[in-house]
């Protein structure tokens, strides 16, 4: 956004009702933390707020944290006035004795590792901020960073990627507090910048929008059908948020009903009209087994007051699938240790508590140190099943099955029905009862039934 030339740039590549939360009179944080406080007081995809400053810069957190919270409360109020059915979902923490929603805003304070000169350039500095933030990589969160350091081009007020369905390190927006955008805490230019970059982060301007700007006016990341639009690429200065409109004409990026991506559908927006206010439950437990490199993760169904849920499956912290089923199949290298997690997601994008489990392929469920907690890996197949007849008796014998936890017994079946369980690798039966198809499967000390191996037909 440029002021007279102030420029807002797109870097390509628990609200309960429609009533806005009151302005906070104080930020209720009782500590200063560089990380994301847990537990979250909001259930769902959300924006986490970060105050960042360079290694050689002054720490203005104490002075700026309340103005930041007040601007975000004003953004919440403005958004609900524009669309009574939606509002951005911000990360809150249940600070004790706090009587306002945005007083509970979870704001992290981060001193970046490099001097201000590393972050002052518009483009390379933006990338350096993203790299040096580190640790803000929750795939279910987007990040709004208020950077308190000098910038080479003070007309550039902020920058954000446009990643509609991404969270984590690929979804970090930056607002430059020391640009010529002014009015932090008073719903003025900084608030306009913040909304502008937030909307970019939610996926605007989508390809196919009817009013993209020409390259010399901000490019196709912005609409050019009117300066009142909060996503217009520049401002003449002195703007206030109340004078701005969320998608002028409602035909470019919000509530348009067209074929292009619609920010109104973003899972990072709370659906205020829905009676569903509670998140789904977490799966009661996870179970994971493997045979070779084939891994099967399963869990009991979660419950939700709004009905059906889907499940987000994560591998080593990254989402890999979303499914209605209560199981997930994966391929992993034998001996590799993988962390799997599952969260239930309801129809209005509330997320249940994450349930996680660590698994070593070919060994079983392990703790943080890699020690075996529960053997869930089936023994290998029984090989070389043989039969020898001696008079009226038939003796079956077989080779050992492989299992890291050691085999406890072998289950012997004839025509699919169990006839014996033995710790030995030999079984003698009457010849008159030997006709049929015989098979043997190992059972390990944890009770896992082994993979089916060779069978033997006796006549």
Task: Give short role names for the model-derived ranges.
Residues 21-142, 147-154, 273-275:
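Propeptide-to-catalytic entry region of secreted or membrane-anchored zinc metalloproteases
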Residues 275-306, 350-404, 448-459:
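Pro/Thr/Ser/Gly-rich low-complexity, intrinsically disordered linker/stalk tracts
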Residues 154-187:
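Active-site scaffold of zinc-dependent metalloenzymes
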Residues 21, 175-256:
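The catalytic-center signature of Zn2+-dependent metalloproteases
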Residues 6-15:
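Bacterial N-terminal signal peptides
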Residues 244-281, 363-373:
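A recurrent domain-boundary module in secreted/ectodomain proteins
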Residues 310-335, 353, 409-433, 451:
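Recognizes extended acidic, P/S/T-rich segments that occur
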Residues 330-350, 431-449:
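Beta-strand-rich modules
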């Amino acid at each position: 956004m440029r002021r007279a030339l102030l420029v807002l740039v797109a870097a390509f590549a628990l609200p309960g009702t429609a009533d806005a939360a009151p302005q906070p009179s104080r930020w209720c944080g009782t500590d200063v933390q560089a990380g994301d406080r847990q537990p979250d007081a909001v259930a769902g995809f959300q924006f986490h707020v970060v105050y960042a400053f360079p290694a050689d810069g002054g720490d203005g957190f104490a002075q700026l944290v309340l103005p930041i919270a007040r601007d975000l409360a004003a953004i919440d109020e403005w958004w609900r006035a524009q669309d009574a059915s939606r509002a951005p979902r911000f990360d809150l923490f249940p600070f004790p004795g706090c009587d306002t929603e945005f007083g509970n805003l979870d704001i992290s304070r981060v001193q970046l590792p490099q001097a201000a000169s590393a972050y002052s350039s518009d483009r390379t500095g933006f990338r350096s901020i993203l790299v040096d933030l580190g640790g803000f990589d929750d795939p279910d969160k987007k990040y709004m960073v208020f950077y308190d350091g000098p910038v080479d081009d003070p007309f550039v007020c902020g920058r954000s990627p446009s990643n509609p369905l991404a969270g984590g390190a690929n979804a970090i927006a930056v607002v430059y507090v020391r640009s010529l955008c002014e009015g932090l805490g008073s719903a003025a230019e900084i608030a306009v910048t913040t909304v502008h970059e937030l909307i970019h982060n939610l996926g605007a301007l989508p390809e196919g929008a009817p009013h993209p700007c020409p390259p010399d006016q901000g490019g196709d990341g912005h609409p050019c059908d009117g300066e009142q639009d909060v996503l217009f690429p520049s401002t003449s200065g002195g703007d206030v948020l109340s004078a701005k409109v969320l998608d002028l004409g409602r035909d470019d990026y919000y509530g348009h009903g067209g074929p292009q991506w619609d920010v109104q559908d973003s899972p990072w927006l709370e659906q205020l009209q829905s009676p569903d206010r509670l998140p789904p439950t977490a799966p009661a437990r996870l179970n994971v087994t493997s045979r070779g490199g084939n891994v099967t993760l399963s869990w009991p169904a979660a419950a939700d007051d709004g009905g059906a849920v889907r499940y987000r499956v994560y591998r080593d912290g990254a989402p890999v699938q979303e499914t209605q089923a209560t199981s997930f199949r994966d391929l992993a290298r034998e001996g590799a240790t993988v962390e799997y997690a599952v969260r239930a997601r309801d129809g209005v994008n509330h997320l249940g508590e994450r349930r996680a489990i660590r698994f070593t392929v070919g060994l079983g469920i392990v703790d943080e140190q890699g020690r075996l907690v529960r053997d869930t890996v089936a023994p290998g197949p029984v090989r070389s099943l043989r039969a020898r007849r001696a008079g009226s008796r038939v003796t079956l014998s077989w080779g050992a099955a492989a299992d890291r936890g050691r085999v406890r017994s072998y289950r012997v079946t004839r025509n699919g029905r169990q006839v014996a369980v033995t710790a030995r690798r030999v079984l003698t039966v009457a010849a008159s009862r030997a006709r049929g198809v015989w098979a043997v499967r190992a059972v390990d000390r944890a009770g896992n039934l082994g993979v089916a191996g060779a069978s033997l037909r006796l006549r």
